[in-house]
Design a protein with these regions (language model features):
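Long, low-complexity intrinsically disordered regions
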Residues: 1-174
Length: 174
């Protein structure tokens, strides 16, 4: 499975679930029957891959973390229109809550329900996703497909976080 991941370099995480969630399917087509838990173990126990936004939410080899640093430094572009001073303060408070109280999913953090946009995400979910897109939070694990966020410092080894990022053009070439 690791060789397949190394060849593909990213696997889109998808909630589509006809037979199994779509991100398990590339391995069936390449490896034949396999234990689906293997991908989850590589992501959440062994940290061979991690979750981050590439074009979509993806599993990416941890060895490629520095290739996405430029994206995390600027965050996702769709966040910028939501950054009022009030929102910035709330986003910071959500990060601090996770830092102080430990891993959390959106439903465990109080916040207003969302509007029709952003899949009706709560304000807490938007804040968690904002911090995740900027690399301050990482996905520690998933429960019933829901992300459990923790501060990146507790999810990844320090040398991963300290590795300098690539320039955007260089990262794209890789």
């Amino acid at each position: 499975m690791r060789r397949t991941i190394d060849r593909l370099r990213l696997i889109q995480i998808d909630s589509v679930n006809v037979l199994v969630r779509a991100h398990y399917m590339p391995f069936f087509s390449r490896l034949g029957p396999y234990r689906r838990e293997m991908l989850d173990e590589l992501a959440y126990r062994d940290r061979y891959v991690f979750e981050q936004w590439a074009h979509e939410a993806c599993f990416i080899p941890l060895a490629d973390y520095s290739l996405l640093r430029h994206r995390m430094d600027r965050g996702r572009r769709w966040h910028s229109r939501h950054l009022t001073a009030e929102r910035q303060a709330y986003f910071a408070s959500v990060l601090e809550k996770v830092r102080e109280e430990g891993p959390a999913q959106a439903g465990e953090i109080e916040g207003k329900r969302g509007s029709k946009g952003w899949w009706e995400w709560s304000h807490a979910k938007v804040a968690l996703e904002y911090q995740f897109a900027h690399g301050r939070l990482a996905v520690k694990e998933r429960r019933n497909f829901a992300r459990i966020y923790d501060v990146a410092d507790r999810v990844f080894d320090p040398q991963v976080l300290e590795t300098p990022g690539h320039a955007e053009a260089d990262a794209h070439r890789e």
